Amino acid sequence: DWMMEDIFAKLYDMTAFSNIIADPSFLIMYAIAFILLYLGIRKHYEPLLLVPIAFGVLIANFPGGDMGVIQADENGMVMVNGVLKNIWEMPLHEIAHDLGLMNFIYYMLIKTGFLPPVIFMGVGALTDFGPMLRNLRLSIFGAAAQLGIFTVLLCAVMMGFTPQEAGALGIIGGADGPTAIFTTIKLAPHLLGPIAIAAYSYMALVPVIIPLVVKLLCSKKELMINMKEQEKLYPSKTEIKNLRVLKIIFPIAVTTIVALFVPTAVPLIGMLMFGNLIKEIGSDTSRLFDAAANSIMNAATIFLGLSVGATMTSEAFLNWTTIGIVVGGFLAFALSISGGIFFVKLFNLFSKKKINPLIGATGLSAVPMASRVCNEIATKYDPKNHVLNYCMSSNISGVIGSAVAAGVLISFLG
């Protein structure tokens, strides 16, 4: 009956149980995956992002499944079947064959920096710059929220991260997944997994984080400032005559200006504005718009989500660096929100026309999530006080702001 025992031993080896019992840290990763799935499915927090990421985390952590992304070290060296190889010198078919599907997607589409700008094109196609152009003076608060990025950068350097790692860590404060990924690839590729997870998780947790920070920093009286009444009391002098023409000129002008001043931000801003331009031109480019906003955007999101999730293997994730990144990312996030709020408070000290501090809190680029959350807070205190359109203007300028901040970091530290 040794035959039977042999067969059972073989069957047991085939399963993942032996490895999981030998290394229970996998169980922590399953727990993280299930929490993220719960947030995405039951709580409806950014399901389009959280569900693919969480599922990526889940499938990456079954030993023997070969779906985890293998992290190359700083010099690009990885273990392939017991041999050290340089990942950048391996042909793609070899990566696919030896390291599996996820590594193929990851090294081809993400590490090369291909997907983030493509997703930005989709974001541009789905963004309406109208609210921002109508309230241009509010868009300055989108710039103020980038303070969190630079504050955390300084703190991280003091804590012993290299300037490059610190820059990648700080960009989490921009609350923008593709920007965080793009910056990290350029500055600290070995930290891509945890930084991407932190950026996307905090983006998804915007409905929890913004109210926390707002409760701490704003009085009820400030939250009840009604922007519409302020408009009536102090009407603005400038009136936009031809919004449609302006909306077409805007993406072209922004790209040109940003490209002249921060050329490293062009891959992100250029694609964002191109996506927006084909939307605003209208029927002549409607087919391009349709592709950018739907099929391309959706396919890119699937590949990005799954492979970013798959970078979260237990050995890559359960260490002090990662925990530092998760904590630092939270700080960057909270500081970005409070930076925007303080900027509004400062503005209100000197201006007759008051601004609701919630408009500072939406300087993050989690669009339109942050604006929706702030609108809910405002209507809770005063059901007639709708701030959505005003929030959108600082929210959307936050997208441009974080991409420009990324460009600045890349050119200084890269």
Segments predicted by a language model, with ranges:
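Entry/N-cap segments of selected transmembrane alpha helices
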Residues: 129-153, 313-340, 391, 395
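Alpha-helical transmembrane segments
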Residues: 190-208, 328-336, 359-362
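N-terminal alpha-helical transmembrane segments of multi-pass membrane transport
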Residues: 2-78, 82, 97
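Alpha-helical membrane segments and immediately flanking helix-loop junctions
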Residues: 108-112, 120-126, 140-151, 161-191, ...
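Hydrophobic transmembrane alpha-helices of secondary-active transporters
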Residues: 36, 106-133, 275-278, 297-319
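Juxtamembrane and boundary regions of transmembrane helices in multi-pass small-molecule transporters
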Residues: 154-163, 195-229, 339-352, 397-414
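Transmembrane helical segments that form the transport core of multi-pass membrane transport proteins
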Residues: 253-340
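Membrane-embedded hairpin module used as a gating/binding unit in multi-pass transport
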Residues: 201-283
